[in-house]
């Protein structure tokens, strides 16, 4: 475990990075914690790295990054993971999914952290899933997977409509004798029966701007 002097160095690096956007010099660190020898400061920094509290890039001068372990040692909340918002999907009849390079992200909810790295977010258009609280304009967290159990809420892609290009929808999934049933959660809408379907992922969470 790092000594008190080392934690003081770690805290000074953190504060200066937040203040200026880059880490302090070794001399500045020494002055801040009462060490006149730069070699002694280097020794403390090396031990902080050995403890996993910070990381140095040997190819760049003054390139120091405080790790999540280091932030915890300072009592700083960890940076939450982020999930990319990659496009639009319908909660109605299947439409061509609008996909894009992610430029927007949502923080990963704590109850979905176990799926970190396997999630994406889609905006929902339509009202076919309102009985289970997925409304027009909501965003759904989707865990990437290419399979589903009967009754799962999924993002499904089918080529049975339009010009044969893949079209996506959010529905409850059922595999039946000679077809797949994509079941809406809206009493006014009929199920969608298709022969060809690909599962893009399972819906595991919901985001709504008005209440989140």
Swiss-Prot record:
<dbReference type="InterPro" id="IPR006197">
    <property type="entry name" value="Peptidase_S24_LexA"/>
</dbReference>
<keyword id="KW-0742">SOS response</keyword>
<dbReference type="InterPro" id="IPR036390">
    <property type="entry name" value="WH_DNA-bd_sf"/>
</dbReference>
<dbReference type="GO" id="GO:0004252">
    <property type="term" value="F:serine-type endopeptidase activity"/>
</dbReference>
<dbReference type="Pfam" id="PF00717">
    <property type="entry name" value="Peptidase_S24"/>
</dbReference>
<keyword id="KW-0235">DNA replication</keyword>
<dbReference type="GO" id="GO:0045892">
    <property type="term" value="P:negative regulation of DNA-templated transcription"/>
</dbReference>
<keyword id="KW-0234">DNA repair</keyword>
<dbReference type="GO" id="GO:0009432">
    <property type="term" value="P:SOS response"/>
</dbReference>
<keyword id="KW-0678">Repressor</keyword>
<dbReference type="InterPro" id="IPR011991">
    <property type="entry name" value="ArsR-like_HTH"/>
</dbReference>
<dbReference type="InterPro" id="IPR036286">
    <property type="entry name" value="LexA/Signal_pep-like_sf"/>
</dbReference>
<dbReference type="GO" id="GO:0006508">
    <property type="term" value="P:proteolysis"/>
</dbReference>
<dbReference type="GO" id="GO:0006260">
    <property type="term" value="P:DNA replication"/>
</dbReference>
<dbReference type="InterPro" id="IPR006199">
    <property type="entry name" value="LexA_DNA-bd_dom"/>
</dbReference>
<keyword id="KW-0068">Autocatalytic cleavage</keyword>
<keyword id="KW-0238">DNA-binding</keyword>
<comment type="function">
    <text>Represses a number of genes involved in the response to DNA damage (SOS response), including recA and lexA. In the presence of single-stranded DNA, RecA interacts with LexA causing an autocatalytic cleavage which disrupts the DNA-binding part of LexA, leading to derepression of the SOS regulon and eventually DNA repair.</text>
</comment>
<feature type="active site" description="For autocatalytic cleavage activity">
    <location>
        <position position="171"/>
    </location>
</feature>
<dbReference type="InterPro" id="IPR050077">
    <property type="entry name" value="LexA_repressor"/>
</dbReference>
<feature type="DNA-binding region" description="H-T-H motif">
    <location>
        <begin position="26"/>
        <end position="46"/>
    </location>
</feature>
<dbReference type="InterPro" id="IPR006200">
    <property type="entry name" value="LexA"/>
</dbReference>
<keyword id="KW-0227">DNA damage</keyword>
<dbReference type="GO" id="GO:0006281">
    <property type="term" value="P:DNA repair"/>
</dbReference>
<keyword id="KW-0378">Hydrolase</keyword>
<dbReference type="InterPro" id="IPR036388">
    <property type="entry name" value="WH-like_DNA-bd_sf"/>
</dbReference>
<dbReference type="Pfam" id="PF01726">
    <property type="entry name" value="LexA_DNA_bind"/>
</dbReference>
<dbReference type="InterPro" id="IPR039418">
    <property type="entry name" value="LexA-like"/>
</dbReference>
<keyword id="KW-0804">Transcription</keyword>
<feature type="site" description="Cleavage; by autolysis">
    <location>
        <begin position="91"/>
        <end position="92"/>
    </location>
</feature>
<comment type="subunit">
    <text>Homodimer.</text>
</comment>
<comment type="similarity">
    <text>Belongs to the peptidase S24 family.</text>
</comment>
<keyword id="KW-0805">Transcription regulation</keyword>
<dbReference type="GO" id="GO:0003677">
    <property type="term" value="F:DNA binding"/>
</dbReference>
<dbReference type="InterPro" id="IPR015927">
    <property type="entry name" value="Peptidase_S24_S26A/B/C"/>
</dbReference>
<feature type="active site" description="For autocatalytic cleavage activity">
    <location>
        <position position="128"/>
    </location>
</feature>
<protein>
    <recommendedName>
        <fullName>LexA repressor</fullName>
        <ecNumber>3.4.21.88</ecNumber>
    </recommendedName>
</protein>
């Amino acid at each position: 475990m790092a000594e008190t002097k080392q934690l003081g160095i770690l805290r000074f690096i953190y504060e200066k990075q937040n203040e200026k956007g880059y880490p302090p010099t070794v001399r500045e660190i020494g002055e801040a914690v009462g060490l006149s020898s730069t070699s002694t400061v280097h020794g403390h920094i090396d031990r902080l790295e050995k403890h996993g509290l910070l990381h140095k890039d040997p190819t760049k001068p003054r390139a120091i990054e405080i790790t999540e372990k280091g932030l915890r040692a300072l009592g700083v909340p960890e940076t939450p993971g982020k999930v990319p918002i990659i496009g639009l999907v319908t909660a109605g009849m299947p439409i061509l999914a609008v996909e894009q390079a992610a430029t927007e992200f949502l923080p990963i909810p704590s109850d979905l952290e176990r799926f970190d790295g396997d999630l994406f977010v889609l905006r929902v258009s339509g009202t076919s899933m309102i009985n289970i609280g997925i409304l027009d304009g909501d965003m759904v967290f989707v865990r990437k997977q290419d399979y589903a159990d009967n009754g799962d809420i999924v993002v499904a892609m089918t080529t049975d409509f339009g010009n044969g290009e893949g079209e996506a929808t959010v529905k409850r999934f059922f595999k039946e004798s000679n077809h797949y049933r994509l079941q809406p959660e809206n009493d006014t809408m009929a199920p969608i029966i298709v022969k060809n379907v690909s599962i893009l992922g399972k819906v595991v969470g919901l985001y709504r701007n008005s209440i989140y």
